Every structure is written in structure tokens, then in C-alpha cells.
Amino acid sequence: MYNGIVLVDKPAGLTSFDVVAKLRKIFQQKQVGHTGTLDPSVTGLLVIVLGKATKLIDYLQENQKQYRGTLILGLKTDTQDMDGQVTEMQFLKEAIADFKKKAAFDSFLGSSDQLPPMYSAVKVGGKHLYELARKGETIERKSRKIKVMEFQQVGGSKFDASKGQEYINFVATVSKGTYIRTLIEDFGAKLGLPATMMRLRRIEADGYDVKNSINLEEILASKTPRKFIIPMEKLLPTLPKYSVGSDDWQLIKNGGWLKELPISVSPVKIFYNNSFQAIYEKQDGFYKPKKMLIHEDH
């Protein structure tokens, strides 16, 4: 079994699960997942986790995500993107003043609550919201805490006088679980206008950049796909690591506690024979297992 991550540049037209399914076949193992869904129309960085690395998703997701895209002012759809049905249109006579757009962008900076859209993979009562949305149903959802570190226009906007619409390129840096589609619709609401997402690309996630990702087709066509795997030992570089000897290893591989470590930090990556085998956290004077990754494979 392979353990580690693969940085995939997801093309438009595929769901995140489609990519996972293809890589399960390529690597011939079931234990394959990802750290954050991308909608079918969205391109960019999809971090695929293999084997024991699936246990590290929570740690990987702690890093921010960055997107670049284009939004439309003057148009609104039921899916908040161009895949849906138009639900509202408002003809703009002229482009919105830059200072008004900046004020609207800036108003989202910081922490806030965001209501997940009906067209999303969030589960309520065992069903995905998008399954209910496709039936025309709208149900009550719980808002989620999000944080927006950056949300601003990039370059000049384009105004189409014939359509009465304005197209704005933007960049957004956000916490996990933030829906950019919803952010855009809310941005339009701040201006008193319908708005929807035209295109979107994820350029950073979990501490990695799309510049270092691999085109999906290249991975699928490769005779040696394992060369694209970033091994477990290179993951979570900001966490301190400690290499144990054979005595401590006998305790660790059975989930045992450790009294003391030469480094007084927590959490800590535990290595044995140069392999990343566990994450321990200090509790009540002892180092206790938080994530067990015991493996001898790739």
C-alpha cells in the first residue's frame, strides 16, 4: 500500500470523487481520499491522500486555501455558478465604482458565519444537500464559522454594456470549509446586486501550491505513478519530529504512553527508522497517541 499525498491539478468537468476513483485504480488500493472538495467546474489543486496519510487530513486542512477566479455582477443562479439556472438578472447601466467594490470586498475580511449553499456536498440527515436541491427542496442548514484573510479585485474589471454585466477578477484566501460561490453571492448582496461565480481555480491548499501539482492525465498515463507521491515523511513540515529508539518503539507501536521526550513540544511527529509512524500529544504529564500511522509499506 502506498502512503503519502499526490498534488493533482484537477481539470474542469470532473468531481473530486471522480479523481479519487481514477487514482484508486492507478494505485490499486481503496484507501484514497482528498483534503477538500472542488466543484466539477472548478480547476486547480486537489490534494489526494493515500493509505495512512488519510489519517492526517485534519492536520493538513488546518492550512488556508487560496483561489483566483472571475465573478459576474448582474446575474444570479440557483447554484451560485454558471452551471445552474438563472434566477435573477439586473441590468447595470455602468460599472460599479471601485471604492464601492473595495468596501464590499473588505467587509468580508475576518471571521464570520457562512450558510452552506443547498448545492453542496454537506450532509444533513444522511443526505447530501445537492440531492435535495435537485428535487427542488430547500431545508434549514446550520451556519459554519469561516475566516477570510484576503478577498480583493485583481486588475481592472470588464463592463459589458450590451448585457449590463460587470466581470471582476478576484483572489480569495480563506479557511477550510469556505464556499467561494456563497462569498460571491453575498458580495453582490452588499452592493444590492445579483452576483454569481463565472470561473474558479484553487491555487493553494494545505501548504502546497498548484505550481507543484501534476496534470491528472499525466498521472493516468504514467507507467510509474508512484514517482508523483510525496512520502509521509515530508508531510506536516511545521510540526516538530522526534526519532525514537527500539525500546520506545515497542511501546509506541502498541499505542503506549511516553513519560517524557527530550523536546518539550506538543504535538510531535514520532519517527522510527526514518519513517513517520505516529503523532503524539502531551496530556496530563504524558505523551499520548493522537494519530497512529504504523506502517511498513511504501
Curated annotation (Swiss-Prot):
InterPro entries in the cross-refs: PsdUridine_synth_cat_dom_sf, PsdUridine_synth_N, tRNA_psdUridine_synth_TruB, TruB_C
Keyword terms of this UniProt record: Isomerase, tRNA processing
Pfam families named among the record's database cross-references: TruB_C_2 (PF16198), TruB_N (PF01509)
Active site: D39
GO MF term set: RNA binding; tRNA pseudouridine(55) synthase activity
Catalytic activity: uridine(55) in tRNA = pseudouridine(55) in tRNA
Transmembrane segments: none
EC number(s) from the headed UniProt entry: 5.4.99.25
Record bears the keyword Protein transport: no
Record flagged with keyword rRNA-binding: no
Family under the similarity heading: Belongs to the pseudouridine synthase TruB family. Type 1 subfamily.
Listed name of the protein: tRNA pseudouridine synthase B
Organism lineage: Bacteria, Bacillati, Bacillota, Bacilli, Lactobacillales
